[in-house]
Amino acid sequence: MKTNVTLIGMPASGKSTLGQRLAEALDFEFVDVDRIIEAEEKRLLKEIIAQEGDDGFLEIENRINAALKMDGCVIAPGGSVIYGAEAMEHLRDISICLLYTSDAA
């Protein structure tokens, strides 16, 4: 049984806000993958993009999302996660993926 929920959506669509509420309702942990990327890379996302370029950032994002190991979590990856084939396959394997849309996006 899949024990995670992953929210897929556009940047700034409200995935983190919804994710925190959903995690609380399900008694799950909330995971913001952007924060994991920053912690692992020891740089802010904007610094990674400035130094590595868009393609370099996408490679890092794909690698980190494809390596996530967790149970009982609501996962909010960045909006560009959909460009990482390995990441998307892994997220489908470890979670129920939901497409979140919002008028705010």
Region locations from a protein language model:
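Walker A/P-loop
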Residues: S16
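ATP-binding Walker
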Residues: S13
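Conserved small/polar residues in nucleotide/adenosyl-binding loops
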Residues: Y100-A105
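ATP-dependent small-molecule kinase phosphotransfer cores
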Residues: V33-R92
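Pre-Walker A (Motif I) flank of P-loop NTPase domains
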Residues: K2-N4
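Hydrophobic anchor at the beta1->P-loop junction of P-loop NTPases
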Residues: L7
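P-loop (Walker A) phosphate-binding loop of NTP-binding proteins
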Residues: M10
